[in-house]
C-alpha cells in the first residue's frame, strides 16, 4: 500500500539520539527517568555517520590533502599525477592503473596522503553541516553535494577542512543520503507525526500519541515475543 509507505530515514529520525541514550542510561543508574522535553532524535549528521565512513580532507596551498587508502584504489586510474601531499613529489603517473600491490608499495615508501584540486571533490557529499565560525551562518547542510558554486563559497569563507561521506558507487552507494534528501522530516517530532498520520489517518496528531504508536510498532516486547516457531 503506497499510502502507508515512508522513507526509512523517517524511522531513524524517530529513534533516540546517542546523546539521549547516554542521558537515559545515566539517569537510570540514579533511579530517575528522563524528562520528555530533553529527548532528541537522531540528527541527519548522526544518521549519515552511522551508515558511512567519513573522509577528512584539508586545504593546503597547492590543493586538498586526501588520505591514501590502498584498499580503495584497486584498479583505479587517476586522471592526474598522484602527488605526495607531504613531499610535493609525483609518486604515480596519471592514467596508470593501480593494483593493491602497487598501492601498498607506495604506502611502504611513505605515502600517506595526496593532493587533489576542486574538480576531484565535485559530486562528493558533506558529512557535516558547514558553518562559518564568526557569523554562525550555515552555508551547506550535511549531505549537500559539492559542486562548483559550493566549493567557491567554501573557498571564499576560508574553510580549510571538510568531512566527506565515503561513497564509491560500487561497494558503497548514496542510498541513505539520497533518502535523507527526499525525506521532508528534519527532526524527531516531525518524523513521529508522519508515522502517526500513516498509521492513524484522520486522527489528531499529538507527540504523546505519536510516541505510543512508534513504540508499539517497534519496541513492544509482547508484540515481538516470538517463540522458535513464530508468534503463538
Q: Where do the language-model regions lie?
A:
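N-terminal non-catalytic structural scaffold regions of very large proteins
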Residues: 1-232
Amino acid at each position: 500500500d503506497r499510502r502507508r509507505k515512508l522513507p526509512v530515514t523517517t524511522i531513524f529520525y524517530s529513534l533516540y539520539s546517542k546523546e539521549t541514550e547516554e542521558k537515559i542510561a545515566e539517569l537510570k543508574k540514579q533511579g530517575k527517568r528522563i524528562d520528555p522535553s530533553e529527548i532528541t532524535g537522531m540528527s541527519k549528521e548522526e544518521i549519515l555517520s552511522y551508515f558511512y565512513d567519513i573522509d577528512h580532507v584539508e586545504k593546503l596551498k597547492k590543493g586538498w590533502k586526501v588520505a591514501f587508502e590502498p584498499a580503495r584504489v584497486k584498479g583505479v586510474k587517476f586522471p592526474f599525477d598522484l602527488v605526495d601531499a607531504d613531499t610535493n613529489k609525483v609518486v604515480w603517473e596519471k592514467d596508470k592503473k593501480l593494483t593493491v600491490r602497487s598501492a601498498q608499495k607506495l604506502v611502504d615508501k611513505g605515502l600517506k596522503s595526496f593532493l587533489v584540486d576542486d574538480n576531484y571533490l565535485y559530486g562528493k557529499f558533506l558529512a557535516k553541516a558547514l558553518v562559518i565560525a564568526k557569523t554562525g551562518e550555515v552555508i551547506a547542510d550535511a549531505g549537500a553535494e559539492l559542486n562548483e558554486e559550493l566549493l567557491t563559497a567554501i573557498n571564499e569563507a576560508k574553510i580549510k577542512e571538510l568531512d566527506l561521506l565515503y561513497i564509491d558507487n560500487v561497494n558503497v552507494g548514496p542510498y541513505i543520503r539520497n533518502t535523507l534528501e527526499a525525506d521532508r522530516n528534519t527532526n524527531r517530532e516531525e518524523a513521529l507525526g508522519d508515522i502517526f498520520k500513516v498509521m492513524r489517518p484522520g486522527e489528531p496528531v499529538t507527540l504523546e500519541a505519536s510516541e505510543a504508536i512508534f513504540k508499539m510498532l517497534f519496541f513492544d516486547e509482547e508484540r515481538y515475543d516470538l517463540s522458535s516457531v513464530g508468534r503463538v
